UniProtKB/Swiss-Prot annotation:
<dbReference type="GO" id="GO:0016409">
    <property type="term" value="F:palmitoyltransferase activity"/>
</dbReference>
<keyword id="KW-0728">SH3 domain</keyword>
<dbReference type="InterPro" id="IPR039859">
    <property type="entry name" value="PFA4/ZDH16/20/ERF2-like"/>
</dbReference>
<keyword id="KW-0472">Membrane</keyword>
<feature type="short sequence motif" description="Di-lysine motif">
    <location>
        <begin position="410"/>
        <end position="413"/>
    </location>
</feature>
<keyword id="KW-1133">Transmembrane helix</keyword>
<dbReference type="GO" id="GO:0010636">
    <property type="term" value="P:positive regulation of mitochondrial fusion"/>
</dbReference>
<feature type="topological domain" description="Cytoplasmic">
    <location>
        <begin position="1"/>
        <end position="24"/>
    </location>
</feature>
<feature type="topological domain" description="Cytoplasmic">
    <location>
        <begin position="216"/>
        <end position="413"/>
    </location>
</feature>
<keyword id="KW-0812">Transmembrane</keyword>
<feature type="active site" description="S-palmitoyl cysteine intermediate">
    <location>
        <position position="129"/>
    </location>
</feature>
<feature type="topological domain" description="Lumenal">
    <location>
        <begin position="165"/>
        <end position="194"/>
    </location>
</feature>
<comment type="subunit">
    <text>Homooligomerizes. Interacts with SELENOK.</text>
</comment>
<dbReference type="GO" id="GO:0140439">
    <property type="term" value="F:protein-cysteine S-stearoyltransferase activity"/>
</dbReference>
<keyword id="KW-0449">Lipoprotein</keyword>
<feature type="transmembrane region" description="Helical">
    <location>
        <begin position="58"/>
        <end position="78"/>
    </location>
</feature>
<feature type="transmembrane region" description="Helical">
    <location>
        <begin position="144"/>
        <end position="164"/>
    </location>
</feature>
Length: 413
């Protein structure tokens, strides 16, 4: 549904710099190795083209490669869709329900979030994917999910070719002795013999490609099921986190209210159709969304504003007592700090003795917060935020006994 309906816009191809990143280089390398080796193994050593089955098999391999690459590049270059710079709601009074992004100089539309990597506010942002070096969001969610489906299917087909090639080529070449196993790599397995013999180099290349194909099938297949779960609930991973924090906030303050997620249409099929359409274009403009009964366009954004206000209330001021160079895993801060470094792409921030930090959340040995640079921090115009070790700072006496609890303990408070 919609696999070939959406078209990569030509003007977006100017951004070829997205290919110059370790994610696309590895992803395209794996696709190239698996598809090329599968075709070579099929034609030369397993299923020759002069047979009907061999021709059908070869066409299927080409088809997998084309569909995988199409959806991959569509997800990369079409992009997730960005909130227009300077955007604001049609009704000026509605701006009170929205957060303002000072980087984009625009209000954050419902379901949009600012991506530090893309440096833009992304429509219905799910996450920034390093493998496509772009965000997964409103406009490319379908292509991204189809890529996650087609890649494991194509790799499963390729893995079958690799296994059968090695089996058919080695079956008559093994000789077992009392203490040894010998392989005669010069023995021919096909009649007529292949143009290129299946030697040690071909065996090693096929075995390597098999490992890549199986690894891709498992890893990317798991990502596909995660995305399908997100689509059927019509709830991105970020929105799942917001909903979890909403329940935590209500429980923490023992409030008499219930948070209802506004974008779950109550039917998996209806949620599915929000992303996958026959035209290949997702439903909606990325700024306004269909909502369930009893909610409005700003139900989620109002909850986000409540959480932001709550975060300010629960934040704790710290003073830096030891320098920190911003290393991801600083061994000089202790073994426990080294091995419990947060597994996230969020940055670490350099600290100098005497600076002040406003911490908003934390782990057992790490804290996350904003460096208080000057008075402009209060206005939100200047922010340097990230993770830093707990043992580099001490709590300011004016903040009493409050302390950002480790994230795993928040629900027990």
């Amino acid at each position: 549904m919609g696999i070939f309906c959406s078209v990569i816009k030509f003007e977006n191809l100017q951004d070829l710099r997205r290919l110059c990143h370790w994610g696309p280089i590895i992803a395209l390398g794996v696709i190239a190795i698996c598809s090329t080796m599968a075709m070579i193994d099929s034609v030369l050593w397993y299923w020759p083209l002069h047979t009907t089955g061999g021709s059908v098999n070869f066409i299927m391999l080409i088809n997998w490669t084309v569909m995988i690459l199409y959806n991959y590049f569509n997800a990369m270059f079409a992009g997730p869709g960005f909130v227009p710079r300077g955007w604001k709601p049609e009704k000026s009074q509605d701006s009170m329900y929205l957060q303002y992004c000072k980087v984009c100089q625009a209000y954050k539309a419902p379901r949009s979030h600012h991506c530090r990597k893309c440096n833009r506010c992304v429509m219905k942002m799910d996450h920034h994917c390093p493998w496509i070096n772009n965000c997964c969001g409103h406009q490319n969610h379908a292509s991204f999910t189809l890529f996650l489906l087609l890649a494991p299917l194509g790799c499963t087909h390729a893995a079958f070719i690799f296994v059968m090639t090695m089996y058919t080529q080695l079956y008559n070449r093994l000789s077992f002795g009392w203490n040894t196993v010998k392989i005669d790599m010069s023995a021919a397995r096909r009649d007529p013999p292949p143009i290129v013999p299946f030697g040690l180099a071909a065996f090693a290349a096929t075995l390597f490609a098999l490992g890549l194909a199986l690894g891709t099938t498992i890893a990317v297949g798991m990502l596909f099921f995660i995305q399908i779960k997100i689509i059927l609930r019509n709830k991105t991973s970020i929105e799942s986190w917001i909903e979890e924090k909403a329940k935590d906030r209500i429980q923490y303050y023992q409030l008499d209210e219930v948070f209802i997620f506004p974008y779950d249409m109550g039917s998996k099929w209806k949620n599915f159709k929000q992303v996958f359409t026959w035209s290949g274009v997702p439903e909606g403009d990325g700024l306004e969304w269909p909502i369930r009964e009893g909610c409005d366009q700003y139900s989620l954004t109002i909850e986000q504003l409540k959480q932001k206000a709550d975060k300010r209330v629960r934040s704790v001021r710290y003073k830096v007592i030891e320098d920190y160079n911003g290393a991801c895993c600083p061994l000089n801060r202790g073994v426990r700090t080294f091995f419990t470094s947060p597994c996230t792409e969020e940055p670490r921030i350099r600290l100098q003795k005497g600076e002040f930090i406003l911490a908003t959340r934390g782990l057992r040995y790490w804290l996350y917060g904003d460096k208080i640079l000057d008075d402009s921090f209060i206005e939100g115009t200047s922010r340097v935020r990230g993770w830093f070790p707990r043992n580099c700072v001490e709590k300011c006496p004016c903040d009493g006994d409050s302390d950002p609890a480790p994230e795993g303990e928040k629900k027990n408070r």
